[in-house]
Amino acid sequence: MNLRFTKMHGLGNDFMVIDGIRQSLPETGLPLPADEIRRLADRKFGVGFDQMLIVQPAQGDADFRYRILNADGSEVSQCGNGARCFARFVREQGLTDKKSIRVETAAGQMTLSVTDDDQITVDMGAPRWAPDAIPMTAKAEADNYFLVSGTQAWDVGAVGLGNPHCTLLVENVDTAPVDTVGPLLESHEQFPERANVGFMQIVSRNEIRLRVYERGAGETLACGSGACAAVVIGQRRDWLDDTVTVHLPGGTLHVCYDGQGGIQMTGPASHVYDGAIEIAL
C-alpha cells in the first residue's frame, strides 16, 4: 500500500500525520501494525518521528477522531503538541475551515482553537489528581510523592492529563539527569501504564524551563501535556501563578490555568513536507 502522509512538528516534537478519512487504513486494532509503526518511526530506515497522528471520522458529535501512536507502536490518549499539528493539518488539507475544532480522543473530547496569528490553543481538560485517575498506585492523593528505586528516592508531583505525568524540581535543566532518571521513573512500579517524566527549573512564578522524557519515545524537544503537567503541579505546590511561559528545548509554550475548567496551552504548529511511502499490511 502506498501511504500518503505529512511530516509536521510542534517545537521540534515531530509527527507523521496520516489522513485516515480519504485513504483506507485497517479497521481493527491499531491503525497500522505495531512493527510497521516502529519501522516508519526509525530515523535511519523510515520517516522518523516521535509520534504518529491519525485523522479519522468522529464516532460521536465531534468534528474528527484523533489517535496518537508512539514510536514504539503503543497507543496513547493525549499529545498537546500533536493536537496543535492536528488542527493545522485538517485545515490545510481542506477537511474543515473551522477555527474551533472539536476532536475525540481516548481521553475524551477536546477543543482546538486557531488564532488569527496562526497560534493554536488547546483545551487540555482539567487535571486529574486522584491516584486511580493518573493512574498510579498510592494510598491517598497528595501534593507530592516519594518514588523509591534501590537506594534512590525522588520527590515528584503527579497528575493525569489523559496520560500519566510526574514532574520533579531541578536546579538546572541543562544538567538534569534526564537520560538516567527519566527511564527509571517512566517505568517505575507505581505507574502501571508508565509515565511521562518532567524535569522543571523555576525561573520565576510566571516562567519555567522544562525537559521531558516521554513514555514510549524518550526525551523529546517539547511535550505540550508535559508543560501543562509541570505548570499545574507547580501551582498546586504554590510555586507558580495562573499564567506561565514554559521554555522547552524546541521552543516556548504558554500555559494558563486558574483552577477552573480546562488547562489552556498555546503554541505553534509547523508543516515540514508531504510525502508517500510503501508499507506492507
From Swiss-Prot:
Substrate binds at residues 13, 51, 70, 80-81, 163, 196, 214-215, 224-225. It comes from the Bacteria. Its main location: cytoplasm. The record marks 165, 214 as: Could be important to modulate the pK values of the two catalytic cysteine residues. GO terms for cellular component: cytosol. GO terms for molecular function: diaminopimelate epimerase activity. The active site is at 79 (proton donor), 223 (proton acceptor). The keyword Amino-acid biosynthesis applies. It is an enzyme of class 5 (isomerase). Pathway: Amino-acid biosynthesis; L-lysine biosynthesis via DAP pathway; DL-2,6-diaminopimelate from LL-2,6-diaminopimelate: step 1/1. The record marks 273 as: Important for dimerization. This is Diaminopimelate epimerase. It comes from Alcanivorax borkumensis (strain ATCC 700651 / DSM 11573 / NCIMB 13689 / SK2). The lineage of its organism: Bacteria, Pseudomonadati, Pseudomonadota, Gammaproteobacteria, Oceanospirillales. The gene is dapF.
